[in-house]
Amino acid sequence: MKISSLFLGAIVLALPLSSAAAYAQEVCNRLTEAEVSAAVGVELHRSPTDPCRFGHAFKSFSIIIHPGDGYRFGDYAANARKEFKDTQEVPGIGSDAIFYATNLAVKAKGDVVVISMYLGKSPAERIALAKAVAQKLIAHM
């Protein structure tokens, strides 16, 4: 049986994507609902369909992990600064972090973590909540 090179190429390209998604799900699954609730000050439940999403609608947050992309954080931050005038540095989390719109992007342990925070009434409150979640998450990486 002969395997086409196109099929083999698709498998090779899909493997890193599936392993990146599996890594993100594994890290998010280590983050407990109790840790999340303590970090944000309200009880939140994990989505039954996405281990990286907690809460519902505008009382929620989600996590995206880009494994191994830490070296690209500078480019990521530069693009955010171009697109969002409210982009600001966030000290005290990871090796580098910025906040823009509703997102905290953190460079930690060679990865980039983005937390989209829909809790909090002001940018300062959203930053504090996202930072608290990020600290818990990074401890599980």
Predicted feature descriptions by range:
Residues 31, 35, 39, 75, ...:
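Extracytoplasmic/secreted proteins, especially bacterial periplasmic and envelope-associated proteins
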Residues 9, 23, 82-85:
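Short, functionally important structural connectors and interaction interfaces within domains
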Residues 1-5:
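Positively charged n-region of N-terminal signal peptides that target proteins for export
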Residues 86-141:
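A short, solvent-exposed beta-edge/loop patch
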Residues 18-24:
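Sec/Tat signal peptide C-region and signal peptidase I cleavage site
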Residues 27-28:
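A structural boundary signal for the start of the first folded domain, especially the loop/turn
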Residues 8-18:
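Bacterial N-terminal signal peptides
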Residues 34, 38-101, 108-109:
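Short, solvent-exposed recognition patches
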